[in-house]
Amino acid sequence: DAARRYERIVSPRAWDVVSGIMDLKKRTGKGDTAELLALDFADAFYMLPLVPDEMRYYVAHYDGAFYMWERIAQGSLNGPGAFGRLSALTARMSQALYPPSSLSLQVYTDDPCAALRGTPRQIKMMTVVLVLFWRAQGWGLSFHKGQLGRMVSWIGYSFTISAEAVIVSIKEDVMKGVRCDGAGLEG
């Protein structure tokens, strides 16, 4: 039992992004601004190759043929835990590229959201460095879904940074099919 380690990966919430933005906004000086970068990792679970001895546990039989995975599958028992460790490591290494006074990074599974502070030029440079760092780590990036600016959508929320406030709303498509009957929520 001494070799066993119990852990729990704590995923970020919308408030963590808001808190990061507010902290950065407090530090803005003349010419500084705060922006958000949301850029998903593509096919993230398939980043982790299986040890050859483990491949025999990742086999499916379909239509008379056997299929063996060479990479961790998203729906596998330990896939989320293994991927969570890789995602958390990537987040820590990425955050270490800049001081907390310039970058506040949250990663929800395979969806990073970075709050950035600096001049527009500095923010562009920080974005380039983050993107190149992630690519150097082997991450595929969903550029077609990428967003940079004062308004982004991330994991079901819309964030808007204004001069006076940080506005968060639940995306409309998330709320479809949910209504309030006065006593509670119904689906």
Question: What spans do the regions from the language model cover?
Answer:
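A generic hydrophobic-helix recognition signal that picks specific residues
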Residues: T33, M68, L103-S104, G149
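Helical (often loop-to-helix) elements that flank the catalytic cores of nucleotide-handling enzymes
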Residues: T119-G138, A163-M175
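Active-site palm subdomain of RNA-directed nucleic acid polymerases
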Residues: P80-W134, F143
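Short, conserved secondary-structure transition motifs
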Residues: A34, F45-Y46, A114-A115, L141-A165
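C-terminal reverse transcriptase regions that engage the nucleic-acid substrate
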Residues: M68, L148-G187
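Catalytic-core region of right-hand nucleic acid polymerases
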Residues: D1-G84, F133, K176-G187
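Catalytic palm active-site di-aspartate
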Residues: D1, A38-A42, G75, Y98-T119, ...
